[in-house]
């Protein structure tokens, strides 16, 4: 850990503590400032943590909580961004508060909900082992644009995590299409019995 990385963590932890004392929430702001001090901080802290990332238009929080329950039942040591801060700044804060100043995470696993618009930037730094994509619909057009733009954001994000196993909704054709042009191993889930099979 170099000086700037340690400084970024110290500032983030201090701001998070002050925000909690003042009851201001303060999940995103500490991470935003930490990344200005050391832009590679998330990548540094996430490299030794086995991470499941969940993104998509609907169902991110529910799917994340279901993943957490599976970890609980298996007795796994994990943390999650339950606060709903699912952009890169909030995700960075969660990694900082779950790590020592040496950069060692106190948990073995992480369950991270990621805003679909942030996937392009987050996945390349997070390098998750599993990426769950729930579905893709037109949503908040003023913020996200057309759904094809959101699909491209997620696709570009996955390209930054080539080792990740994709868990895709086979009942959503746009989501399932991510398996067609990416080298990642893909498995599928869905209600329809004709859901796409796993692809090696």
Where are the language model's segments positioned?
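Short, basic phosphate-binding NTP loop
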Residues: 1-53, 73-74, 89-97, 198
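Short, flexible loop segments at the rims of nucleotide/cofactor-binding pockets, characterized by
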Residues: 30, 87, 108-112, 142-146
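Walker A (P-loop) phosphate-binding motif
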Residues: 39-86, 155
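Acidic, Mg2+-coordinating active-site environments of NTP-dependent enzymes
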Residues: 49, 106, 137-200
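Hydrophobic/aromatic beta-strand patches that form the interior of the parallel beta-sheet core
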Residues: 52, 79, 130-132, 167, ...
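Gly-rich Lys/Arg/Thr-decorated short loops/hinges at beta-loop-alpha junctions or inter-strand turns
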Residues: 72-73, 129-138
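Short, structured coil segments at secondary-structure junctions
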Residues: 74, 126-127, 181-184
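Conserved nucleotide-sensing/catalytic segment adjacent to the nucleotide-binding pocket
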Residues: 90-133
